């Protein structure tokens, strides 16, 4: 997330970091800057859901909120050294944001986009490890998500036939 003073805060998210997965989740659920900042400040996560959530057993997949909330390495598993990172610029983020083997990194910016109530919201951008700059995320995430859904439906239809 790019903060007002242009520094960027970020954290690693392990599960399904592709535009059709995490990218789609970001544009669908993570458009309030205060919510995004709080989530990032909790550090590296196994997965991001629809909301931050409360401390939960890391492997407690039976918990009612497990499928919907974020699950963090520090808060939920007690790991150390998994705090958020601070980058001085987009260039620094592009250079150093792929240190955990990520294929994609994401950047939320406040560029004046508003929600239906007129409140400012985060606009998301992404970069693949071989890209030189961030590109708008929304169209790519939606199209990739649709492709994933089509593949899923094709598999379901094979099973029925």
List PLM regions with ranges.
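Short, extreme N-terminal segment that most often corresponds to the first beta-strand
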Residues: 1-18, 22
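All-alpha amphipathic helical-bundle segments outside canonical DNA-binding/catalytic cores
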Residues: 25
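Low-complexity intrinsically disordered segments
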Residues: 28-161
